[in-house]
Amino acid sequence: MVRATGSVASRRRRKRILKQAKGFWGDRKGHIRQSRSSVMRAMAFNYMHRKDRKGDFRSLWIARLNVASRIHSLSYSRLINGLKCANISLNRKMLSEIAIHNPEGFAEIANQAKKALEATV
């Protein structure tokens, strides 16, 4: 009886791993056993860092808003509180973009937040 090796599927599977290991250094790019473990590790880091990226961007937006709001004599937390009191529902990404690309518009938003804070006190 003919021996079934599954060679086509095996070759395809190995080639896929080696293709993903392109750019790795040393044996990691050419030997299937090292490549497989390196690719799995890289994929795990990739997954983790895709999740981390969301928080990284949020931190960046908050830092930008803190700088922009302090120009208008508000802290970041008082700016956000004032916006909530004024019923202005802009997210941090949008506020950050406004602060960078349209400082006059951000000044108006900050003034509305200040007025709302003064009204609540």
UniProtKB/Swiss-Prot annotation:
Transmembrane segments: none
Superkingdom: Bacteria
BP-aspect Gene Ontology terms: ribosomal large subunit assembly; translation
Keyword rRNA-binding attributed: yes
Disulfide bonds: none
Any one GO CC term of the record: ribonucleoprotein complex
Keywords tagged on the record: Ribonucleoprotein, Ribosomal protein, RNA-binding, rRNA-binding
InterPro entries in the cross-refs: Ribosomal_bL20, RIBOSOMAL_L20_CS, Ribosomal_protein_bL20_C
An example molecular function term from Gene Ontology annotations: rRNA binding
UniProt-listed Pfam families: Ribosomal_L20 (PF00453)
Gene3D superfamilies: 6.10.160.10, Ribosomal protein L20
Function recorded in the entry: Binds directly to 23S ribosomal RNA and is necessary for the in vitro assembly process of the 50S ribosomal subunit. It is not involved in the protein synthesizing functions of that subunit.
Record-stated family: Belongs to the bacterial ribosomal protein bL20 family.
This protein's name: Large ribosomal subunit protein bL20
Native source organism of the sequence: Chlamydia pneumoniae
Gene: rplT
